[in-house]
């Protein structure tokens, strides 16, 4: 901290001393480090540094670190979305070599992940070009696909490591997961490992688990499995 002197309008007034934080550039931000160097507290501190007005902790994070066939580093956070979804606030930030470029990442980050927060840093992303150009760029396609894969891998890991905790978080993350399932074929192909289907009695099943549970006693006249669903647990 530094001690500063505040000028007074009155010539004979006693100068007032105030303390202010030193403002310095972080020469080694969290996303440039290896995941093994960071603790959960480090990730949380970085999130608060990025979004000081966000008071709820993120649900979990995804660390990006690849240098071939493209260069990409970054940290993405799954926020607790609740019912207030605002795509124009606290967006993902794009950097190039630790220099902030923009928080307009349409065409770089898949649409279904635009609700996430954090930082991506890559010198391989062309700047000042249209979204259609970005989507056609070979490096950007690979980066977008890699981000999608990392999110899917993270979901698979979370549900395997702590199924109970994952189920508790499902309502907060399902809008992202379900949007990804209908918009990204590669994500849909992986989703059978982590997408959950809640039943009216409060249980959660993956698609494979649900199929195994009902296939022998919920079939039509042709022997095909029938899945019953409701949009209103109480009214139907």
Segments predicted by a language model, with ranges:
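Conserved GHKL (Bergerat-fold) ATPase module
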Residues: 2, 6-236
């Amino acid at each position: 901290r530094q001690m500063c002197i505040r000028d007074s309008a009155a010539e004979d007034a006693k100068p007032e001393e105030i303390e202010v934080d030193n403002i310095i550039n972080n020469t080694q931000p969290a996303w440039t480090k290896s995941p093994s160097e960071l603790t959960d507290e480090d990730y949380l501190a970085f999130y608060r540094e990025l979004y000081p007005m966000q008071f709820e902790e993120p649900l979990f994070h995804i660390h990006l670190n690849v240098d071939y066939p493209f260069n990409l580093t970054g940290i993405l956070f799954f926020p607790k979305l609740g019912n207030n979804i605002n795509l124009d606030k606290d967006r993902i930030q794009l950097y190039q070599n630790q220099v902030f470029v923009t928080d307009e990442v349409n065409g770089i980050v898949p649409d279904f992940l635009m609700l996430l927060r954090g930082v991506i840093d890559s010198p391989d992303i062309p700047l000042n070009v249209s979204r259609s150009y970005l989507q056609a760029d070979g490096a950007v396609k690979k980066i977008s696909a890699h981000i999608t894969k990392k999110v899917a891998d993270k979901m698979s890991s979370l549900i395997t490591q702590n199924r109970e905790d994952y189920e508790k978080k499902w309502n907060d993350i399902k809008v992202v997961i379900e949007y990804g399932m209908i918009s990204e074929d590669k994500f849909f192909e992986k989703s059978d490992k982590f997408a959950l289907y809640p039943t009216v009695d409060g249980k959660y099943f993956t698609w494979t688990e649900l199929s195994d549970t009902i296939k022998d006693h919920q079939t039509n006249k042709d022997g095909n499995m029938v899945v019953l669903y409701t949009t209103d647990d109480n009214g139907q």
